[in-house]
Regions:
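Protein maturation boundaries and topogenic segments
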Residues: 1-96, 171-175, 179-195
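Structural motif
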Residues: 71-72, 86, 107, 149, ...
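Extracellular/periplasmic catalytic domains that process cell-envelope and extracellular macromolecules
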Residues: 81, 110-111, 143-146
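RNA pseudouridine synthases
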Residues: 99-110, 114
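Short strand-turn-strand beta-turns centered on an Asx-Gly dipeptide
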Residues: 118-121
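Short gly/ser/thr-rich secondary-structure transition/capping motifs
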Residues: 132-136
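Beta-strand-rich cores of mature extracytoplasmic or soluble domains
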Residues: 139, 143-195
Length: 195
């Protein structure tokens, strides 16, 4: 005769424990999926905001010293409204340059040999410039800004290549990335940029 194997039935406590383990595993997976989807959504929104509305830019070079230093990181805001004194970012030869708006369309810009700037025959007050300089200039002053363009200059006039040079020239609306408004790095200098 064959021996019949008798299987032991699990107790109620064992069944409840196994059911609890399975439910926990299911809840864990649900929470994990939800967290991953949330992180992906937040990352996608952050990328869209950073590229479409608030581009984040790193400063390279010394053309905007003392306002902006090499290695600093700033936010810019996409806008079509720019006024003299605003710091703007724009595309130039597959790079992004950052300069200060000096004059708008149809304005007359003049500069004397010492580096003092005049817009529409009025001396431009520039507290953001430490040292005036004529800099690298190959345009003829007085210069009238063409329609639909803005005249920009770096704050460190001796080293900046800007609208004073035909290589860069005046900046068109299509070239503009946005207005630089906020410094985020280094942390001890975090804050809004002054005009």
């Amino acid at each position: 005769m064959r021996k019949k194997r008798i299987e032991e039935r699990p107790s109620v406590q064992q069944l409840e424990k196994e059911l609890s383990r399975i439910k926990y595993k299911s809840r864990y997976r649900t929470v994990l999926k939800s967290t991953v989807y949330t992180l992906i959504t937040v990352a996608a929104v952050a990328v869209l905001v950073a590229t479409l509305w608030l581009p984040v830019l790193q400063i390279y070079g010394s053309s905007m010293t003392p306002t902006l230093q090499d290695g600093q990181i700033v936010f810019s805001v996409k806008t079509s409204e720019f006024a003299p004194g605003d710091v703007v970012a724009f595309y130039y030869n597959n790079k992004i340059l950052i300069k200060r708006v000096i004059a708008g369309p149809a304005d007359w810009v003049n500069m004397d040999a010492d580096g003092t700037v005049y817009v529409n025959s009025e001396k431009l007050e520039e507290p953001y410039v430490n040292e005036l300089a004529y800099g690298e200039t190959n345009i003829e002053f007085p210069y009238q800004v063409p329609d639909g363009r803005i005249f920009v200059m770096g704050d460190h006039r001796a080293t900046s290549v800007d609208s004073r040079n035909t290589a860069v020239g005046c900046v068109s609306q299509e070239q503009l990335v946005g207005k630089v408004i906020f410094r985020i790095w280094p942390l001890e200098e975090m804050g809004f940029l002054n005009r």
